[in-house]
Amino acid sequence: MNDIKVSVCCFTYNHAPYLSKALDSVLSQKTNFRYEIIIGDDCSTDGSQDIINAYAIKFPDLIKTIYQPVNSRGKKNFSDVYKSAEGQYVIALETDDYWTDPNKLQIQVDYLDRHPACIAVAHNCVVVDEHDRQLARKYPAIDQGVYRYKHFRKGLMPGQTTTVLYRNPKFVENLDMSLYNNPISGPGDSRRLFCLMTAGDVITLPYT
């Protein structure tokens, strides 16, 4: 394992209007550890790649880029980015979302560092439209505490995708990710969550 603490896995397809805000929210994180940003573009046609290139040139030590030659409908783009993740912990950020707390990563990393039995930690988030108008008070329905199989069976999630920081499966000996590679067993987020739950606790923190 290298000294990268967190791999921020960014996924974009025609997100040009939102891309800078998403990346700036990652770059504004205040941390005492090293992190990397991996941006996977799924053959965008709206100028997203120009924006990505500008950030990669400006932050060459932080940002890695992966460009799909043809649109993969997410599948290969997600796979290639996750395979490139070298951090001890991993978090996804689809680039039409963004983070609002500059201490977000530090808070979640500190929690996982202090709780070795915990494999993932999430938190609530506010849902907004493309004009930043709030659509919902928060997401998900799990306010805080341990996320359990009873929640999974009801279709509830511990947090929206970009709130979930988890231990990199590459470095977790007892974590079987084979179900994640079975596309007939449900959406990718749910498959990954189910696999993570077999290897440790999933916790939702009481903040947005």
Predicted regions and their residues:
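Cell-envelope/extracellular polymer assembly enzymes that use nucleotide-activated donors
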Residues: 4-7, 36, 191
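Acidic helix N-cap motif at the loop->helix transition within catalytic regions
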Residues: 18-20, 46-54
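Short, acidic, metal-binding catalytic loop of nucleotide-sugar glycosyltransferases
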Residues: 24-34
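A conserved acidic beta->alpha catalytic loop
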Residues: 41-50, 70, 94
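Glycine-rich, basic loop-to-helix element that forms the pyrophosphate-binding segment
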Residues: 68-85, 107
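Short aromatic/hydrophobic "clamp" motif used to bind/position activated sugar donors
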Residues: 90
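Conserved donor NDP-sugar-binding/catalytic core segment of glycosyltransferases
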Residues: 103-136
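Conserved nucleotide-sugar donor-binding catalytic segment
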Residues: 123, 141-208
